[in-house]
Amino acid sequence: MKKIIFIILAFGCMLSLSAFDVMDISGDIGLGYMNHNMVTVYNDSLKTNLAGGLEAALGEGNLTMDAPRSVDSYNALALGLKLKVSYVYANISVGFPFTQVPTGDDPLGEKLKAMGATNRLNNSVIVDSQIGLGINILKSLPVNIFVGGGLGINYIQTKRKLPDEFVQTIVDPITGNPVAKELNETRSIAMSGLGFTVALNYYFTKNIGISFDIKDTVYFIPMSNKRYYKGKAINGSGFTYTITKEKKQDIQSLIKYSWANNLALRLAVAFKL
């Protein structure tokens, strides 16, 4: 209850300051399109074996080799909100992708692909946020431009059902009998980076207008990268299986580096308080 009262009082203070031109408060809310591309470069265990084979066949030398990499692309309908208070702004977009478009080499996904795993996603979400500093150009005119830049934080969670052909390969190592009847893959990735926001605003009244926003962020600092599987055993019991390596509950040890780009375009209702 105290938190609710505090939020109401804080919002009331902001409105009061805005009314006396002490604080400039504006923003927009609307629908748009989101494109998210995730690039992952993996550590390559083949390099050591290839170097040994070449040395035996050709003689001692140095080997340079491209590391395997994959690109996962997502297109989504997005909801977005931007709030600007004086020179500080916050921008968040939430996208709902329905398909994944993978290209390149994903060592963890090759077996699933061979079994006919679908690229259709279920209950997946991309949350892309940005906070930073920005200014309004031509602020006093009905048509003005907002330009800002700052820190971006992105979280993506994708889910897909794995094919029955693959589930049937999960068998008891002793009896050879199937032990699972359903399996779903979940990927969870969080990253941070830097980005910018540009918006063209047109106010047809003093406080209400329309806005076209462009938000683009490059992510290069990994925060979390997990891939796990949920399913049902043959007796109906639910289970969760997390890929591990060297006793770590993630796949970071398989990844050399990764980066991502998120682009969001939005047509929105603009407002000023």
Please place each PLM-identified region on the residue numbering:
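Gram-negative (and chloroplast) outer-membrane scaffold detector with strong preference
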Residues: 79-174, 266-273
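Transmembrane beta-barrel architecture of outer-membrane proteins
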Residues: 72-80, 124-130, 191-195, 260-264
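Cleavable N-terminal export/targeting peptides
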Residues: 1-24
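Membrane-spanning beta-strand positions in outer-membrane beta-barrel proteins
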Residues: 24-26, 89, 142-146, 199, ...
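Predominantly the C-terminal beta-signal and adjacent terminal strand-loop region
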Residues: 201-273
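Short glycine/proline- and aromatic-enriched beta-strand/turn motifs that initiate or cap beta-hairpins
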Residues: 19-86, 262-272
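Polar/charged side chains located within well-ordered beta-strands of beta-rich proteins
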Residues: 33-37, 75, 90-92, 119, ...
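Flexible, solvent-exposed loop segments that connect beta-strands
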Residues: 39-69, 98-124, 155-189, 224-256
